Amino acid sequence: MKWKGWDRVRLDPETGAVRFQGSPAPLVDAIAPIIVSASRSTDIPALYGDWFIERLKQGYVTWKSPFDGRIIPVSFVNTRVFVFWSKNPRPFIPSLANLTKDGRQSLFLFTLNDYTREDLEPGIPPLGERIRTFAEISSLIGRGRLTWRFDPLLVSDTVTIDDLLERIGSIGDQIARFTERLVISFIDIARYPRVQRNLAKCGLSGIREFSSEEIRLFASGLSQLNEEWGLEILACGEEIDLTGYGIAHGECISLDQIAREFSSDQ
């Protein structure tokens, strides 16, 4: 099915309510998506949970398009599912109940990496605490609605393929029973100057991209680990074909997953 774009509505910016032409209030055009990704640009569950719940009460939010910089109102009038991206959703746990009051549901893409020794992810809780949070989120929303995301996969002067597999194996052994799905992505440095600048700023010049042979070596090792876990593994945004290792091409946000998990929501 070809995507035909978002539904559009007219809303009152003071109240967030959808109105029809002829209303005395000044109206603005808004998109009204069924699925809202919140958000790849920042960690809303970790940092802006209270703000998000307040916007949910207001019924809309404004979004700055990364393509042309336009400010676009987004109405929640049609929204059925929120997809949250987070490295630390623990602060958001008390707010989860608010999402279901109006029949809305949630999926989580929980980025759970282990680059502790390299200090690549400052400001997040220790790995053990994040693993406990992963288990708690799973108990609240269900394992089918919680995706483990290991992103980015990288190698460096201190991180070898074997090191990476050992770290992933340790995490997977602890959380596989709390999820059904693992999404991976390999670091892409050459294509993104911003990534190059950030790595240089942190003094992390030894980090590099995988060679094709290293990708296959890693995929083989991950496939062996998954014999114990039984997870669906997808490579998000990758050109290389890893299906021979049981790693499918896929999207980070899976419409099949959404349809499966919310099949009763018509």
Language-model segment annotations:
Residues G123-I124, Q196-L199, I247-S254:
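Short, surface-exposed amphipathic charged segments that create phosphate/polyanion-binding patches used
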Residues I184, L204-A219:
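Substrate-binding surface in catalytic domains of secreted glycosidases
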Residues K2-L11, S212-Q266:
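C-terminal accessory extensions appended to soluble enzyme cores
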Residues S41-D43, K87, T111-Y115, D151-L153, ...:
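Active-site beta-loop-alpha junctions enriched in small/polar residues
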Residues A46, R117-E118, L154-T158, A190-P193, ...:
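Short catalytic/ligand-binding loop motif for oxyanion handling, primarily in non-cytosolic enzymes
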Residues T116-I124, P152-D162, A200-S211:
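Surface-exposed cleft-lining segments at the edges of enzyme active sites
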Residues E129-Q196, G221-G237:
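Conserved C-terminal portion of the radical SAM core fold
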Residues M1-L120, L127, R132-R143:
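Conserved Radical SAM active-site core
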